[in-house]
Swiss-Prot record:
Gene3D superfamilies: Ribosomal protein L30, ferredoxin-like fold domain (3.30.1390.20). GO terms for molecular function: structural constituent of ribosome. InterPro entries: Ribo_uL30_ferredoxin-like_sf, Ribosomal_uL30_bac-type, Ribosomal_uL30_ferredoxin-like. This is Large ribosomal subunit protein uL30. Part of the 50S ribosomal subunit. CDD domains: Ribosomal_L30 (cd01658).
Amino acid sequence: MAKENRTVKKVTTIQKTQVSSKHNTVSVTLVKSFHGRLPSHRETIVGLGLKRINHTKKFKDTSEIRGMINKVSYLLKVEN
């Protein structure tokens, strides 16, 4: 059997998200330590990118982010 040489072109699209718009963002601050919490809750905090107490990040207000916030809401302060 003869080998076929196939070339595959990968096409990537980069979606730019603007986090700076006022009405579609959520500001999240870690107010309690996540040490000693459930592993899934720790992973959620790490997934949000929060590293230490009083660390704040802004996110685009999506259902995925809202679900993560709801899971660990007892550790966070959320502002619109």
